[in-house]
């Protein structure tokens, strides 16, 4: 009896089916990888947009805080009494001495010293209007414009330590807008002081040498007073002049 050869006849038919299934699996994996890559790019774009929106929100909140400060302080700083406060006989009630508002500071280093002087004078005459550090900082910021105002915006945020620290705010303002002319003058003063010290040191050495020559009897050398730093020390006497 001849056995049927079913296994050999089915084998060629099953090979194309397996190959088709493998192709489907490969296509599915490729599609998943492409989808995953697209989702990652979209997520990265969304994160960048979120960071940008967060920065914009922080900037808007800081500007809003600054605008609120500007709106609150000038209204409270009324230098002269209103018309309704004038009495019937035309006299004004006793008030604090009139003081003009400090000129706005836009970031010019050459104007910083004058601006801070005006601020100090104003706050001295209107001390009752600044009960705390926050009010002093807020008023100073209200007189900033241009580049200086942009610099102050981050320091007016709620988490800024300088918002309630007037002296710290002044120190940071001076560090940011320090005058180059003032620093050049300080450098010149330090250079002149060092030169004066060198002149005085040479004068002390000259006097010591004169004493040693006089004690040894090798020659006389008058002891002059120490130089004050403005004129050079007298030259040592030369023994070869009489030769």
Curated annotation (Swiss-Prot):
Q: Where do the record's region annotations for Disordered lie?
A: 1-22, 84-105, 218-243
Regions annotated as coiled coil: 29-69
Which Pfam family is one of this chain's hits? DUF4939
Skewed-composition ranges (Polar residues): 1-12, 85-94
Q: Which UniProt keywords apply?
A: Coiled coil
The source's domain of life comes to Eukaryota
Task: Kindly state the tissue distribution recorded for this protein.
Answer: Widely expressed.
Return the similarity comment. Answer: Belongs to the LDOC1 family.
Any extra remark in the record? RTL6 is one of at least 11 genes called Mar or Mart related to long terminal repeat retrotransposons. They do not correspond to functional retrotransposons, but rather to neofunctionalized retrotransposons genes.
Query: What is the name attached to this protein's record?
Result: Retrotransposon Gag-like protein 6
Q: What's the source species for this entry? A: Mus musculus
């Amino acid at each position: 009896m001849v056995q049927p050869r079913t296994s050999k006849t089915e084998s060629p038919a099953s090979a194309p089916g397996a190959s088709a299934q493998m192709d489907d699996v490969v296509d599915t994996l490729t599609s998943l990888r492409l989808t995953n890559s697209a989702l990652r790019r979209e997520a990265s774009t969304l994160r960048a947009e979120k960071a940008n929106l967060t920065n914009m929100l922080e900037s808007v909140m800081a500007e809003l805080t600054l605008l609120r400060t500007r709106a609150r302080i000038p209204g409270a700083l009324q230098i002269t009494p209103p018309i309704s406060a004038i009495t019937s006989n035309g006299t004004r009630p006793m008030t604090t001495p009139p003081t003009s508002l400090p000129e706005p500071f836009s970031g010019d280093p050459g104007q910083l010293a004058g601006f801070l002087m005006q601020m100090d004078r104003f706050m001295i005459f209107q001390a009752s209007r600044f009960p705390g550090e926050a009010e002093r900082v807020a008023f100073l910021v209200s007189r900033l414009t241009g580049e200086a105002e942009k610099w102050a915006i981050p320091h007016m945020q709620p988490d800024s330590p300088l918002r309630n620290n007037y002296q710290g705010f002044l120190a940071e303002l001076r560090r940011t807008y320090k005058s180059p002319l003032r620093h050049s003058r300080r450098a010149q003063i330090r250079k002149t002081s060092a030169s004066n010290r060198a002149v005085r040191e040479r004068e002390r050495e000259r006097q010591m040498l004169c004493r040693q020559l006089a004690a040894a009897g090798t020659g006389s050398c008058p002891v002059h007073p120490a130089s004050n730093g403005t004129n050079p020390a007298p030259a040592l006497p030369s023994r070869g002049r009489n030769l």
